[in-house]
Amino acid sequence: MRHWRRVFAHVAMISARDLLRTPMTTISMATVFVVFLAIQLLLQWSVESQGGDVDLLGADLGIVFMAGCCAVALVGTSVPLVAMRERGTLRAFATVPMPRSAFLLGMLPVRVAIVLLEMAVVLVVAGARGHLDGAPLARFAATATIGAAMLFAVALLVASRGRSAEATQQSMAMVSILVVFASGGLVPDEIVPGWAVAAMRALPTTWFAEAAAADLAGDPAFAPVPVLWAGMALVAVAASATAVRRFDWDSRGRARRPNEREKTHA
């Protein structure tokens, strides 16, 4: 366990340092959140300036937060890991005893910090609009924790065998956009066919957005929030376990560790 903690701390430090050295990476991860929030603020201002009383911002804050988490996790986590494999960095790591779980989790602390910053912004906006009291705040904290854990687990699973950073970035950016539109808030259910609504509600990202909207704006979710939590938790556990088991250090195939070579020659 002591070795596991040392590896985790070392990887976390390296990951944080790399992000500090490449501020454009951090900016790109935050851009999606900032853009979606700015759009919602502009729409709300437009409604209120015309005398309307529709709370578009409160209804879509959950989607804004989920979109920000998708950018940090699906793009900002999976792409750097695949790039490390593509450059051969992971192959070098494979020559020393390093638990996969410690390495993968060590990539997350600095990215979790970005998610927490986005969460703080969402809470400030929601509080300013009078949406928060004790119970919703605690529920949103639970939703954010479980939902972010799910997205990070999926990101690690995607990165576990990815070979091309460019292809991963393009695919994950497209997935992030699609799941935001499939979450239901940006496209009303009334204009979507019933089968499409059912398909969108089957997506774990929709569970995240629905639970967050219920916490932040009191919007009724299509299922009880604890049920949505349970579904997201199951996805997180399954994806993280599979990511650790399938993680490949080498772009040309799984690199053997020194002790594995010794067993082969014995």
Give residue spans per PLM region.
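Aromatic- and glycine-rich beta-strand/loop motifs that create alpha-glucan
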Residues: 1-33, 252-261
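Membrane-interfacial helix-loop-helix junctions in multi-pass membrane proteins
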Residues: 18, 134, 183-238
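Hydrophobic alpha-helical transmembrane segments of multi-pass membrane transport/permease proteins
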Residues: 20-47, 57-77, 117, 174-181, ...
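Hydrophobic alpha-helical transmembrane segments of multi-pass membrane transport proteins
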Residues: 38, 57-129
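Transmembrane helix segments
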Residues: 38-47, 162-202, 206
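Hydrophobic alpha-helical transmembrane segments of membrane proteins
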Residues: 50-83, 142-156, 160, 243
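Alpha-helical transmembrane segments and their short interhelical loops
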Residues: 100, 104-173, 177, 223-229, ...
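Junction motif at the cytosolic side of a transmembrane helix
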Residues: 128, 216-219, 227-266
